[in-house]
Amino acid sequence: MFRGATLVNLDSKGRLSVPTRYREQLLENAVGQMVCTIDIHHPCLLLYPLPEWEIIEQKLSRLSSMNPVERRVQRLLLGHASECQMDGAGRLLIAPVLRQHAGLTKEVMLVGQFNKFELWDETTWHQQVKEDIDAEQLATGDLSERLQDLSL
């Protein structure tokens, strides 16, 4: 399980160094193999360990290619999916087209989200967090049933 937000830097080749606390888990569970794709709702990337991505692929394969909305989701997620292998120094090379999609340049937020990571441009991440907090403060009881059961 991945949690927390960590500032990491992209090097001149577009590689990011995976924080040490995640490396062993990624090597053990995915042999360092990852899949990166776009987030279809936010300007960030989704980074999955390969076994987790394979579960997503199975779900995507069950969508109908005859339904335009389902086909669009397949096209966006699968069409942008790029495999990346963690090297001996714990770095992952993020494809240029993906970096461009998310506006990643130097400072990147690696955000743990249970079974995957989100990759955000640092400035965009902080803006999104502010928007989310503001929206939550303005919310007036529109909690889903699952959120109503969440006790912190």
UniProtKB/Swiss-Prot annotation:
It holds the Pfam family MraZ. GO terms for molecular function: DNA-binding transcription factor activity; transcription cis-regulatory region binding. Residues 5-52, 81-124 form the SpoVT-AbrB domain. It is found in: Cytoplasm, Nucleoid. Its main location: cytoplasm. GO terms for cellular component: cytoplasm; nucleoid. Keywords: Cytoplasm, DNA-binding, Repeat, Repressor, Transcription, Transcription regulation. GO terms for biological process: negative regulation of DNA-templated transcription initiation. Belongs to the MraZ family. Negatively regulates its own expression and that of the subsequent genes in the proximal part of the division and cell wall (dcw) gene cluster. Acts by binding directly to DNA. May also regulate the expression of genes outside the dcw cluster. PANTHER family: TRANSCRIPTIONAL REGULATOR MRAZ. Forms oligomers. This is Transcriptional regulator MraZ. It comes from Shigella sonnei (strain Ss046).
